[in-house]
Every structure is written in structure tokens, then in C-alpha cells.
UniProtKB/Swiss-Prot annotation:
<protein>
    <recommendedName>
        <fullName>UPF0301 protein CBU_2093</fullName>
    </recommendedName>
</protein>
<dbReference type="InterPro" id="IPR003774">
    <property type="entry name" value="AlgH-like"/>
</dbReference>
<dbReference type="Pfam" id="PF02622">
    <property type="entry name" value="DUF179"/>
</dbReference>
<comment type="similarity">
    <text>Belongs to the UPF0301 (AlgH) family.</text>
</comment>
<dbReference type="GO" id="GO:0005829">
    <property type="term" value="C:cytosol"/>
</dbReference>
Amino acid sequence: MRLSGDPRILSVIMVKTNILSNHFLVAMPQLNDFTFTKAVIYVSQHDAKGALGIIINRPLALTLGKVLEHLNIEIAQPQIANHPVLMGGPIGQEHGFIVYEQESPQGAEILLSASKDMLDDIAKNKGPDDFLITLGYAGWEAGQLENEIARNDWLVVPFNRKILFETPLKSRWQKAAALIGVDINQLSGQIGHA
């Protein structure tokens, strides 16, 4: 199903029906919060109680090799050591998350795990083929994300696995917005309501 038209209308429809899970939030240019400037967030969970997401384009000065070394996990595949670790959000940055794809009878699903066993499997090249490693997450209380979207802080964009796993980190902000036909670089930092 392809939806077209004003992305703000699409955002309102999605918010009112609470179907933001498995979507991206793309920070609008006027969002001047250090943590969220030019952020792309994968929304893992959204319901009446709030939302949880992971920033997918903010690398830390940390690699998976350093994390595995800290956890005393031996690396069987040397190339895995250079895998970037991302700042997943401002909450719980002492906690790590693995964002990965898993096949199910309903099709591919994106899941989050905090399992040390999964990190061990990844180090042994027995884990998922595609994954992100993050520290922290972004969270919203009931109604908070909806208010931010209504304030034009975020574009709501349908999920795309290439953006999540294949697009270079520096290109994800532009490429995610382009999924709904928006050239984010052409938008003004001064946006309001008509």
C-alpha cells in the first residue's frame, strides 16, 4: 500500500491510530536538541502508554570490539570488532541493545534484545546477519510523541530495512526523509502551522 500526500496529514493519521511502531521518526531541521538534531529513530513500540525508539544514525567513539572486550567475550571474526556502536538515545545509556531482523511465519520482524548470549553469538559469527548495537534509547510518555509530531518536530516515515541496516550512517537522515518524497535539505529550519 502506498500513501501519498502531505506527510503531516499522514503523521496525524498514524498518531491517532497508534500505529507508529515499526516506523521511523526523522527529525525536522528546526529540532535543535543536541541529542535529536538530524536524528533518525526506529520506533520499536508505540501504544497508549507511550513510545520507545532507538536512534539509528548517531555513532559513538566506541566499537563492538571494545564492548566485547569489556564483557570478556572472545571475537571469532576479526571484522566484527570494527562494527560501530550507536547512541540509541538519552535514556539508560549504560544499557546496550541489539536491533536485529528475524524471520517469522508472518515475515521478517525487527526485534530488540539486551542479551549477552546474543552478543556472544554475534562474536562467534552465529548471530543475525544484520544488526545494530546501541547504548540507550529514546522514550516518550503517553501523548508526548504525539505532541512533538503535531509541533512538526518529526516526520513519520514507513519502515525500510535498507535504511536500518544498509544505508551509511551519515546518509540515513536524508535517505529516510526521501522515502516519502521529502528533500530534507530543502526544508526551512523555521516551520510553523498554516
